[in-house]
């Protein structure tokens, strides 16, 4: 019989059904059932008790959800936006580290508003990559980063979404 382990997921997206399926596939054969517990980003401080029991906390924020209109039209990321996002992550990770010993897993930003055909090399894509680098440099000792776009590119889309090939 598998034991169940709750994984708090701090997000500003409706990702519950997707995460349930993905975590279930990841834990196949591991003797543990990973159960996501979605926590709205704006309410993350209200759920302090769950972090202390968790082995990991997954943070998956959507830049567009945090800062609507972040792309200034020329593809550049305004410096103020980058600083705000950086401070937000530092505050979030600092709080989680103070209430828990859980491993922090952060999904890096992607430009979800760009069609896939123009993402690679597009100016706004480069701005998002620059923001991801800043976040990684600032929090490299506190968290593990998941770069989903590059991970999927390295294994191919067929394998990335297949539980058997994962």
Set out the residue ranges of the language-model regions.
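Extracellular glycan-modifying ectodomains
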Residues: 1-166
């Amino acid at each position: 019989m598998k034991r169940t382990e709750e994984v708090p997921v701090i997000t500003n997206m409706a990702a519950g059904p997707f995460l349930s399926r993905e975590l279930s596939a990841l834990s196949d054969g591991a003797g543990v059932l990973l159960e996501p517990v979605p926590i709205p980003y704006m309410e993350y401080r209200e759920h302090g008790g769950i972090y202390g029991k968790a082995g990991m906390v997954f943070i998956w924020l959507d830049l567009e959800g945090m800062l609507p209109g972040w792309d200034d039209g020329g593809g550049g990321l305004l410096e103020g936006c980058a600083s705000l996002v950086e401070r937000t992550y530092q505050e979030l990770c600092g709080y989680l580290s103070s209430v828990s010993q859980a491993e922090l897993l952060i999904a890096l930003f992607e430009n979800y508003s760009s069609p896939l055909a123009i993402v690679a090399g597009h100016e706004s894509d480069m701005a998002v990559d620059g923001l991801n680098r800043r976040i990684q440099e600032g929090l490299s000792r506190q968290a593990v980063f998941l770069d989903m776009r590059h991970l999927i590119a390295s294994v191919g889309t067929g394998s990335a979404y297949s539980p058997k090939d994962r």
